[in-house]
Amino acid sequence: YVATVFTTHATVTGRCVAGNGLPLYKDLGRLNAGELARQFNVVAKHSIEKIASQEHDVFCTVSEITARECESLLGSTVDVVTPNGFEDDFVWNGREFDEKRAEARRAMIRTAEATLSCKFDGEPLIVGTSGRYEFRNKGIDIFLDALKQLAETDALDREVLVYITVPSATTGPRKDLQAHLADENSPIDPKQNRFCTHYLEHPEWDQILNSIAGSVLANPSSKVKVVFVPTYLNGRDGIFDKSYYELLVGMDMTLFPSYYEPWGYTPLESTAFSVPTLTTTLAGFGLWAGSQGEHEGVTLVARNDDNYAEAAREIAKALLHFTKYTPQEVEIARNAAAELSRTALWSELYAAYEKAYSEAIERSVTRTNRAVLNDGGGTTEQINFVRQQLITEKPHWNRVMVEKVLPKRLHALEVLSHNLWWSWTSGARDLFEYIDQKLWSECEKNPIVFLDRLPLERLQELEQDGSFLAMLDGVYAMFNEYMSEKPDPKAPTIAYFSMEYGLHSSLKI
């Protein structure tokens, strides 16, 4: 037998509610998860989560706040809370750490001065945030509002450099910025958005840039400077060419004021690099850090459904307070952050998983309806129970499969529908749209389903449609030419893996 453990790191319905600006927490006990799943078109995902949470030996999640969410939205009580741990073997030590930090600071200051066309008077306080581009869930909205309040504070007497490293839809690094970083005599293009390091596909709709535009953060004389890096920092971004960790190590403080955050690896990673961080009481990590007592390395801001303005003020206040730190106070906060991170190592947190696995094994024995007979000696025997099957008089249902048969003249349609070649060939797509555009849309552009639903009368019409047949013959000839090409045995083999996107919408994942 196999013991089963289901661990969820969020609920799809909860994430949808939070991400769409609806209150999640104060109405949690009254939310109708099934109806919400239908509204947000996530019925399948919600159903899988709900069934998985019920058909388990042990049900786990990563934080107490998500445990309450699961109980309300999935209807299942969490058996064991299993906080996320990590290994610190990716963190540099000693001299290498200091060199990496100094190098990161130089790179971030130099890039900001080039992007913003400014010059820092002294050493700025470098703060940052990162993660998925979920404007409300990740607290990017409240972070920007707090920065605006900070920028308008007369008590701010130090420049603050803010990096928002959140991947978005980009078309590559800015060429003018690349050229200027390679040669300072190369000019910066004034037509480009000066807050962004990369070209965005739709900058006019970007929530971060729109929040900055027209605010005090857009004022060149503001002491708070914001740079948006909308790409993955994987060492090949074209501007920094450094990994996320290679920039994180150079920051003075990070902020992750999330509204929806079942755990939150980003603030934990921050503490691992001795960077003090700010999080909230709506984040799993924030609640866990708060349970460790008062801590100089982590600032915890209270958030709920009704205190947005108050929380924004607290975040601005925490930032202002940090700008006033003496070098000794900064060192204390950095050491405290590193110390806290060591309590989140897997060696400290794995016990919760061991508990979950042990309970799962015990429950699976009961679930399998097996008994162990012991003869009192050293021999045991496992017996499978076989229950008596009651036979009742009832009708037997047999499944009958009815397969369509296309007219011979239209057989090419059948062939085309079973090869994804049609999905990237406009002529092939036009064929199916020509037949019945409305039905094509109703079938979600799935040619196999589409042909199954075509009425016989329409097929007979197509057999006599000269224009359509000429189009079909042309496309089919292109397809046969494509299929006749012999693959190059020396060509690279490509495999496609994605948890979110299929090759085509008709190919479900």
Which role fits each region the language model picked out?
Residues 1-509:
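Catalytic cores of nucleotide-sugar-dependent glycosyltransferases that transfer UDP/GDP/TDP-activated
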